[in-house]
Amino acid sequence: MEQTGPDVPERVGAMSGGWTAEQLEAISARGGDVLVAASAGTGKTAVLAERIIRRITDPIKPVDVDRLLVVTFTSAAAAEMRERIRLALAREISRRPESGHLQRQAALLGRACISTVHSFCLDLLRQHFYRIGLDPSFRVADETEAALIQTGALEEVFERRYAAEDNIFAALVDCYGGRHDDALLQELVLDAYKFARSTPWPEDWLDGLAEGFNLPGGASFDRTPWSAVLKQAAEIELAGARADLEAALRIAREPGGPQAYLANLEQEHDLVCRLLQSCRTNAPWAELYSYFKEVVFSPLKQCRKEDADLKLAGQARNFRESAKKKVMQVKSRYFSLPPEDLCADLRRMAPLIKELAGLVREFDATYRKAKAARGVVDFNDLEHYCLQVLAEKGPSGAVPSQVAHELQEKFVEVLVDEYQDINAVQETILQMVSRKGEGQSNLFMVGDVKQSIYRFRLAEPGLFLKKYASFSAGTGGGQGRRLALTANFRSRQGVVSAVNFIFKQIMTPAVGEMAYGSDAMLVYGADYPPVPEGQGNYEEAVELHLVERGPAGKDGGGDDPAGEEADGGVEAVEEIEEELEAGQKEARLVARRIKELLGGSPGGEHALEIYDRELKKYRPLTYRDVAVLLRATAGYANSFVEEFRREGIPAYAELSTGYFESTEVETVISLLKVIDNPRQDIPLAGVLRSPAVGLKAGDLARIRLASPRGDFYDAVVAASLAGQGELSERLADFLKKLEEWRTIARQGTLADLIWAVYRDTGYYDFTGCLPGGGQRQANLRALHDRARQFETTAFRGLFLFLRFIERLREGGRDFGAARLLSEKENVVRIMSIHKSKGLEFPVVFVAGLGRNFNFRNLNKAVLFHKDLGLGPQLVDAEARVTRPTAAKLALKHRLKMEALAEEMRILYVAMTRAQEKLILVGSARNLPGCARRWCGPAGTAGWALPDGFLAGAGTCLDWLMAALARHRDGAAIRELAACAEEPPAEVAADRSRWRVFFSDSRGRSAEMAEEPVLLAKVRRMEPLEPAGPLAGMIKARLEWSYPAIAVLGRPAKAAVTELKRRFDQLAAGEEQYGEGHFESFRLTAGRPLFMQEKRGLTAAEAGEALHLVMQHLDLTGSLDITAVRSQIEDMVWRELLTPEQAAAVPAEKIAAFFAGPLGRRLLAGFQVLRELPFTMAVQAAEIYPELVPYPGEAVLVQGVIDCLVDEGDGYLLLDYKTGKRPLGRPEEAARRYCGQLNIYARAVESILGRKVKEKYLYLFEPGLEIRCD
C-alpha cells in the first residue's frame, strides 16, 4: 500500500477546463507582484501563456498585447510563446469574428514585446542610442570577435604597464602571473572584469575590493565579512564529526560493543559539542583559536577479543577516526593562525588588490575604446547600456529615468519566465520597467529555483529565494504574493516518488540553499492509463546501476571531492584515464539496457510499451524515445557514441571535441599555415607528406639533401630546380599552386581560398573515399563555413584566422566534429543535463553519476564572490611562501557550498526529465568501502541527511546511495557495508520503488538484492545458501536456442527496388525466393575517365543526372525551358554536374513537366521535400509469406522518395521514371511501379505522421502522369 501523510501529498485533481486549482490561481492572480514557484513538469509555460491570453481576451478589462512585456530565457521560448498566443487568438477570432479588439490583437502581435532580456535591451538601445552617446549603426559582436578584441586590448594594457616600469604592477605579475609569463595574470584580469560586469554598478564593485583589506591597526578579525563564513564552515564540519561520534557511541553501547572506548568517545563528544556551540553562538575568533589550540585526541584503549565483538569495535573505530579527521582538519585549515596574523595577511594584500582593480578599469576603458572603433558592442554591453538608459545611480540604488517611467506607464504587466536564472543586472532592469506601490506593482515571475543551473553564467538563484522568503503565501500582503505549482503532469508515479524520496533527504538549507518541503515536493498529476495486458513489460521501479571502476584495491567514489586539493599533474591524468574507462563501461551497460527495453535481447524481456499522448494509446519504445543525460559531455559522450555505434544503436550527440584533431582538418590548417608563411618547416613537411601532395618519406629526405642548410622551403625550391625527374616536377607544380593560393589569400576572401585548395588538390574528394568519408567531408565543409563566418566580423585575412584557431586550441576549446545525423531522426539522444532542461523523454538514462564534482576552480590564486568580494592567495616572493588568506578560505567555502547546491539542482533537472522510466548509472571503486561510507548516516533521525555528510560528498552517487541505503530496497547496501544501524521507519517505508544492480569490472551484471549480499558473505567467510532458482535461470539461458529457424538466411535489409522485383515475381506465380536469392545492394563506382570519353553516359547515369537536376532546381523563379537550361549551366559551374551529365539532361522535358498540372501543384505546395531518404521496419511476413508464423520478425526497408509536396491537407507523392525503355500501356507501368509508391506512402505516414492523399508516377520520356490508387 502506498504511503500518504503530511510529507506525501495526495494525487492532484484537475479542475474544469483542464486547469488545476493551483494553475487557475496563478493564471488569475492580480493586484501586486506575484512569484510562482513552479516545480518540474507542472505546466508553467502553459500557465504563463494562458495568463497572457486571458489578459488580452478579457471581455471586461482587456489589455493590448503590445502593452505586456514578456521576458523569456531563450529566443526559442519567445517564439513558442508568440505562436501559442497567435493560435489562441485565431481560435477566439473564429468564435467571435465580429470582435474588433481581437482583430487588433492579431495585428499587434508582431510588434509585441515578447523576447529575451538581450533582445529587449537591443531594441531599447536602437531607439535611445543618443541618450548614452552610442553610434546608431552599432552591431553586436559575436563571441569570436569579442574574444579577439579583448585579447588585443589586454595585450595593449600590459604593454603600457611594462613600459611604465611600475613596481606594484611588477609585484602583481610576480605573485599571480605564473611561472614563465603573465598568462595567469591576464586570465585573472579577464575573470575580474567579467565578474564586475555581472553587477549593476561594476565601478562600485571594483572600488569595494580593496576596502575590506585596508584594516586599521588593532582591528578585530570578527568585524570582517569573512569571519562569519569561516565559522559556518567550521560548524558544518563539526556537526559531521559530532554525528560520527554519536554513531560510535551507539555501537559501543550495544551488547558486545567496545565499551572500553566509551570514556574516550564521551569525552571527545563533549569537546566537539562545546566547539560546535561556540561556532553557532558566534564566539570571538580569539576565543575559538584558543579552544582549538588545546584540541587533542587521546589514543583509544585496547579492546580484546574476549571483551567485545571485534567487528563492532572496528566500526566504532572507523566512525571515531572520521570524526577526528574532521576536527583536526578544521583546526589546521581555519585556526592555525591567531586572528592578529590573519589581519596582517589581509593588510599586506591591500596594495596588490588596489592595483588589480586599477588594471581591470584600464582594460575596461581600452576594450570599450576598441569596440567603439569597430562600431560593435558585446552581449554584456547590451544590458549595461540599457541600464544606463533606464536608471540613474542614487544613494540607495537605482533610480528610474524618464525612459523607465515611460515604459512603466506603457507596460500593464511585466511577465518573466525562468526567473530563477536571471542575474543582478537583469533584475535591476526589470525593476526599472515595472511599477511600484500599493496595488500598482505589476511584476509576474515564474520559475523553479530547484532548476537554477546556470551559476557558471553568473545567474543568481538567491534573487528568487529572497523573494520567496519575503513574499506572502496565499492572498498576498507584504512585498508580494507567493504561489506554488506542484502537480507534475510529466512523470509516472514511480519517477515522482523517487525524486521526492531523494531530495527530501539531500536538499537542505545549509547545503542545497533551500528545504525540500511540501511546497517544493512533486505531486503526481499525469494520470497515465493502465498498461493493457499483454502489451509489453512495464516496471514502476527506478533503476540504479553501479559499475565497478578500476582496481578493487583502491577506495574511491568521492573520498577526494573532485580533486579539490589536487594540483593536476599525474593524479589528474590518472583520474581522467580512469573516468574514460568508467565511461566505456557505463556506455556498454546503457547500450545493453536500451536493447533490452526495445526487445532486442534474445531470451530477454519484451519491448517496453510507452504511452503516446498524441496517439492516445500505448506503443512500443523507439530509439527517439530514449535520452542519455550527462553532467558534461566532454570525454564521456565520445565513449557512448562509439559504444552505441558498435552495438548498432543510432545516436546523436553534440560533441565539443574531436574537430581540430581530425586528420583532414589538421592537413588543411597546415596547408593554410604554409600559404600564410611557407617558411614553417613542420607544416610544410606535413603538407608535402599528406595526400594533398603525396610525397613519401624518402622524397622528404632527398629534398633536404638538395639544400642541407636553411629553411625547408629553400630546400623545396632547390629540389624543384634540381632536375630530379618526377619529384622536381611535382614540387614545381606545388610551388606554382602555392603562389596562386597566396594571390587568392591577398586578393580574395578566406572562404574562396579554402574552396580553391579543396578543388585544386582534390583533397575534398579524396577524403570522401576514405572510411568515414561523409564525416570527413562534413568537417571540411564546416571549416569553410567557419572561415566565411569569421570574415563577417571586423577581422579579416588568413593570418588572423589562423591566430584565432591557435588561440582556441591553446584555451582547450574545440568546435566539435560536424554532425551528419539530426536529433529529429529516430536516434538515441546523448546530451548534457543543461541541454536537456525544458525537455522530456519517455526513457531517461542519467549516466556518469560517479564522476567527481569539479572544484578545481577553487584552487585558483584569486577567487571572486558577489557578496564577499575577492579572496587572494598570499604570495611572499622573497620568503618563497604561499598560503591562503582568511578571505580566500571564506570564499572557497562559500563557493564550494554554492557549487554543491548547483550540482544538487542539476541532479534534480536530470531526474525530472523522465516521463515513464528513469535509469541512473554510476561507477565507483571498491564497492564495500564505498558502501560503508554511504551507510555512515543511515541511522540519522528524520528525513534530512547530515549537512556534514552532504557537504563532504564528492559525487552525485554519494548522495543517491546514502539516501537509498535508508530505503527498504537498499537493504543489500547496508548488508554489504555490514551496517548494524537501522534507518528511520518513515524513511525506510517510503512509497518509492527501487532496483539496484551491480556490474563488476568484467561487465557482468546482477541485481544487488542478490550478488552483493553473496559477495559480502564470501568476503566474511560465511556459508552460502543452496543455489535456488538462480541455477535454473542460468541453465535455461545456456540451453536456449533461437526459435525462428526459418528466418535465418533471409536478408534483414532490402531496398524498395528489390521489393518491387520480388513482388513482380510473386505476382507472376514464380517460386519463392530461397536463401541468397535477394540481390544485394551494390555501390556503383564511377567508370574511369578514359571509358567515359569513349562511351558517354549509360542510361542509369543519365537518369541519375536528371534526378540530381530535379533535386537542386530553384523552384522560386520561372521554370520555362530557358530558365531550366540556365539553372543546369549554373549547376555545372557549381560543380554539382559534369558537362557530360548536363548534356544528357532533357531540359525541354523538365520544363514541360513544370508547365503541366503535376508541376504546377508542386510549385504551389507549402513545402517541397526532394530526394528524401527513409528507413522503415515492416513485418517479415509481408515480404516472405512463408514467415507468417513468426509475427515478431521484421525487415528493414530503405529507399529514397523523389518528391513529397505538402499541400496543407496532406502530401502529394511523386516518383519520376527517366528511362527510354518502353513501359507499355499506363496500366502496365502502374502495375510495375505502384507497389513501390505504396511502400513510400506507408513510410511517409509512419515517420511523418501525416496522410499521403495522392501518389503519382511521372514518365519523363512520354511526358505521362499516372495516378496510383
UniProtKB/Swiss-Prot annotation:
HAMAP family: AddA. Pfam families: PDDEXK_1 (PF12705), UvrD-helicase (PF00580), UvrD_C (PF13361). It catalyses: Couples ATP hydrolysis with the unwinding of duplex DNA by translocating in the 3'-5' direction; ATP + H2O = ADP + phosphate + H(+). One of its GO terms (molecular function) is ATP binding. Heterodimer of AddA and AddB/RexB. Belongs to the helicase family. AddA subfamily. GO terms for cellular component: cytosol; DNA helicase complex. It comes from the Bacteria. Residues 17-492 form the UvrD-like helicase ATP-binding domain. PANTHER family: ATP-DEPENDENT HELICASE_NUCLEASE SUBUNIT A (PTHR11070:SF48), UVRD / RECB / PCRA DNA HELICASE FAMILY MEMBER (PTHR11070). The heterodimer acts as both an ATP-dependent DNA helicase and an ATP-dependent, dual-direction single-stranded exonuclease. Recognizes the chi site generating a DNA molecule suitable for the initiation of homologous recombination. The AddA nuclease domain is required for chi fragment generation; this subunit has the helicase and 3' -> 5' nuclease activities. PROSITE patterns: UVRD_HELICASE_ATP_BIND, UVRD_HELICASE_CTER. Residues 541-838 form the UvrD-like helicase C-terminal domain. The keyword Nucleotidyltransferase does not apply. The keyword Aminoacyl-tRNA synthetase does not apply. This is ATP-dependent helicase/nuclease subunit A. Its EC number is 3.1.-.-, 5.6.2.4. ATP binds at residues 38-45. Its cofactor is Mg(2+). Keywords: ATP-binding, DNA damage, DNA repair, DNA-binding, Exonuclease, Helicase, Hydrolase, Isomerase, Nuclease, Nucleotide-binding.
